[in-house]
A protein has these predicted regions:
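Intrinsically disordered, low-complexity regulatory regions in eukaryotic proteins
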Residues: 1-103
């Protein structure tokens, strides 16, 4: 199963196309732009509490059969935070000084 490529930052709603180098994901594939992940969320996923990594870029060219962005399409469903900005800020403040591997 291919990684789900969500089309937007869940915090600021910025478009994050499949080839966006600034897309960040947590281990549950929650998706945020680098600016929000670093400056608003402080490397704390507001949904699970985990950290973020760069989202891999799916190849645009089919170099192996069936393996490219046109054969395994990105999601077109926009996802938004389930929590208030205030709740997210408090959640991130509680966890930001704990390394992701210890959360």
């Amino acid at each position: 199963m291919a990684l789900q490529l969500r089309p937007n930052c869940e915090y600021c709603d910025k478009d994050l196309p499949p080839n966006a180098a600034e897309a960040r994901i947590c281990s549950y594939e929650c998706t945020f732009c680098a600016d929000c992940a670093d400056n608003e969320l402080h490397n704390v996923c507001p949904n699970c509490g985990g950290g973020f990594e760069r989202r891999p870029i799916r190849p645009a060219i089919e170099r192996r059969p069936g393996v490219c962005v046109t054969k395994q399409l990105p999601s077109d469903k926009r996802v938004h935070l389930k929590y208030s900005v205030e709740d997210v800020a408090a959640h991130c403040a509680r966890l930001r000084d704990i390394p992701p591997q210890e959360r």
